[in-house]
From Swiss-Prot:
The UniProt record lists the keyword Nuclease: no
GO process annotations (BP): DNA-templated transcription termination; transcription antitermination
SUPFAM superfamilies: NusB-like
Record protein name field: Transcription antitermination protein NusB
Protein's organism: Rhodopirellula baltica (strain DSM 10527 / NCIMB 13988 / SH1)
Pfam family, one: NusB
GO CC annotations on file: cytosol
Protein function: Involved in transcription antitermination. Required for transcription of ribosomal RNA (rRNA) genes. Binds specifically to the boxA antiterminator sequence of the ribosomal RNA (rrn) operons.
Keyword Transcription regulation: yes
Family per record: Belongs to the NusB family.
PANTHER family: ANTITERMINATION NUSB DOMAIN-CONTAINING PROTEIN (PTHR11078:SF3), N UTILIZATION SUBSTANCE PROTEIN B-RELATED (PTHR11078)
Gene3D superfamilies from the UniProt entry: NusB-like (1.10.940.10)
Amino acid sequence: MIARMSTRRRAREIVLQLLYEADLNDWRDAATSRKFIRSRLQGRKVLTDFAAELLDGTMARRDDIDAKLTKLSTNWALHRMPVTDRNVLRLGAYEILYSGTPGQVAISEALTLAKRYGGENSPRFINGVLDRLFKYHSNPESVSS
């Protein structure tokens, strides 16, 4: 189980790299992204498929995810957030909303990414936003607009 979690974590790290890149540059095509993922995950099909699903899903639903994050990230415009934080939030939000990953697992994994790649305040900020998103997704009346 530990190996599975750490390898899935590695897949998430690779997806974060690609989301970061897509945020700053033109989006790679899916074939180029899959090739990058496959090379970083040493061709492991299950992990490559997992990473590709996270990347493709996050990119396909980015506008919807951004709208939800904007609504729930009080006093923070998405475009003003650090690029890393914004993309950790997008990935975590995709997992909570669409992937079937349990909410607490998605939040925990996002916090791990934030601690590793974000700034000093990133984990606390990301935890707050994703926790609100998870609560809202679970029960829309639980979070005020």
